[in-house]
UniProtKB/Swiss-Prot annotation:
GO terms for biological process: apoptotic process; apoptotic process involved in embryonic digit morphogenesis; B cell homeostasis; cell-matrix adhesion; cellular response to glucocorticoid stimulus; developmental pigmentation; ear development; extrinsic apoptotic signaling pathway in absence of ligand. Residues 1-72 are annotated as: Disordered. It is a peripheral membrane protein. Forms heterodimers with a number of antiapoptotic Bcl-2 proteins, including MCL1, BCL2, BCL2L1 isoform Bcl-X(L), BCL2A1/BFL-1, BHRF1, and BCL2L2/BCLW. Does not heterodimerize with proapoptotic proteins such as BAD, BOK or BAK. Identified in a complex containing BCL2L11, DYNLL1 and BCL2L1 isoform Bcl-X(L); BH3 integrity is required for BCL2L1-binding. Interacts with YWHAZ. When phosphorylated, interacts with TRIM2; this interaction is associated with ubiquitination and degradation. Interacts with MCL1; may sequester BCL2L11 to prevent its pro-apoptotic activity. Interacts with GIMAP5. GO terms for cellular component: Bcl-2 family protein complex; BIM-BCL-2 complex; BIM-BCL-xl complex; cytosol; endomembrane system; mitochondrial outer membrane; mitochondrion. It holds the Pfam family Bim_N. This is Bcl-2-like protein 11.
Length: 198
């Protein structure tokens, strides 16, 4: 006895997949590949009323048949909230469907898992190194220990030049005759250094 069209439509869903009365939609856990829902590719010109044919669309069914679009039970999946049918699904080279990622630009941070840093990461590293070099090359007034060392070196150089010139002009007699002058000159340089620090 031939089945009524209403019975045929109740056993076959909108996409052409045959449903048994006791069959329930598979519950997929989040993250499972959606290619587990294999569907037949519909043939709109199949026979619509044979006794042995319970689906209007005749197409090969089996685990190797490629799915044309996500099944009708994708709407019942919790993942459907975040996708719109087949518009966000793309097929990779392995044949599985996966979600497309958003096309936002790369973040300004380094990915430590890659060996070669990306161009934004290289620019960010260059910026950080430039800022570090500018911080190290501060003026002498900002770093008192360097300024004191420079002043002491300058005082020593001036003292050596003055002492050598004086000894040369006086034929080695000035240093021996006037040791107080040398000490006073050195004290004058130290007082000038302390005065500049305040």
């Amino acid at each position: 006895m031939a089945k009524q069209p209403s019975d045929v439509s109740s056993e076959c869903d909108r996409e052409g997949r045959q449903l048994q009365p006791a069959e329930r939609p598979p519950q997929l856990r989040p993250g499972a590949p959606t290619s587990l829902q294999t569907e037949p590719q519909g043939n709109p010109e199949g026979n619509h009323g044979g006794e042995g044919d319970s689906c209007p669309h005749g197409s090969p069914q089996g685990p190797l048949a490629p799915p044309a679009s996500p099944g009708p039970f994708a709407t019942r999946s919790p993942l459907f909230i975040f996708m719109r049918r087949s518009s966000l699904l793309s097929r990779s080279s392995s044949g599985y469907f996966s979600f497309d990622t958003d096309r936002s630009p790369a973040p300004m941070s380094c990915d430590k898992s890659t060996q070669t840093p990306s161009p934004p990461c290289q620019a960010f590293n260059h910026y950080l190194s430039a800022m570090a070099s500018m911080r190290q090359a501060e003026p002498a007034d900002m770093r008192p220990e360097i300024w004191i060392a420079q002043e002491l070196r300058r005082i020593g150089d001036e003292f050596n030049a003055y002492y050598a010139r004086r000894v040369f002009l006086n034929n080695y007699q000035a240093a021996e005759d006037h040791p107080r002058m040398v000490i006073l000159r050195l004290l004058r340089y130290i007082v000038r250094l302390v005065w500049r620090m305040h």
